[in-house]
Amino acid sequence: MSQPVYALNLFNVANRDEYLAYSRRSATEVKAHGGRVIALGKFHEAIVGDMAPRNVLIVVEWASRQDFDSYCNDPALVDLHPHRVNGTDNYIWHLFDKLEDLRPILKDEA
């Protein structure tokens, strides 16, 4: 059985019109490919860390890595993804495996 993955998207909007062209269609396409936006946020404050802040946060839960890949590689969306690229800058896009708890990370390797 495939495990869900979470896509963390952090970015700045660089071109409003380009990003609007992306966002008008992306929500429907994300859902059609097994994704669900679970968090949207606007930068508020840096507490700890040395990463340059990004203005936008989006977290998408994908049913599986395969669903994420199908969204990224679907030939029917070849005209969509360039709007994201051209509408943003300083983009960070990381995938995280879903965990029920931290035991897989904290277990003793000894």
Residue ranges and their predicted role:
Residues 1-77, 94-110:
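Short S/T/G/P-rich N-terminal loop/turn motif that feeds into the first structured element of a domain
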Residues 78-88:
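C-terminal structural segments of small proteins and small subunits
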